[in-house]
């Protein structure tokens, strides 16, 4: 099990990107949260098996139909918070 702390850049706010991230998290069976940042980027904390996180991260990089993801930074960690679900934080 790993944790990814991700920051997505580009047109990722006001386009349903957080909902898309939540759907992808459910599809890849990862837990954590997603939230908008004041700087226009989106922050994601995701935990799960390594292969699931890799597939999830690839989906985030591709983005939703209405988003335009220009970059995603990922910090990997073994310090898990123990999330059981994935939620949108406001």
Curated annotation (Swiss-Prot):
Q: Does the keyword Hydrolase apply?
A: yes
User: Which reaction does this enzyme catalyse, per its entry?
Assistant: an acyl phosphate + H2O = a carboxylate + phosphate + H(+)
One Pfam assignment = Acylphosphatase
First-level EC class: hydrolase
Supply the EC number(s).
3.6.1.7
Q: Does the keyword Endoplasmic reticulum apply?
A: no
Catalytic site positions: 18, 36
Q: Which domain of life is it from?
A: Bacteria
Which controlled-vocabulary keywords does the entry list? Hydrolase
InterPro entries, from UniProt?
Answer: Acylphosphatase, Acylphosphatase-like_dom, Acylphosphatase-like_dom_sf, Acylphosphatase_CS
Chain ranges of the Acylphosphatase-like domain: 3-90
Q: Care to name a GO molecular-function term for this sequence? A: acylphosphatase activity
* Family stated for the protein in its record: Belongs to the acylphosphatase family.
Q: NCBIfam families, per this entry? A: PRK14420.1 (NF010995)
> Could you identify this protein by its name?
Acylphosphatase
In the UniProt record, the gene name given for this protein reads acyP
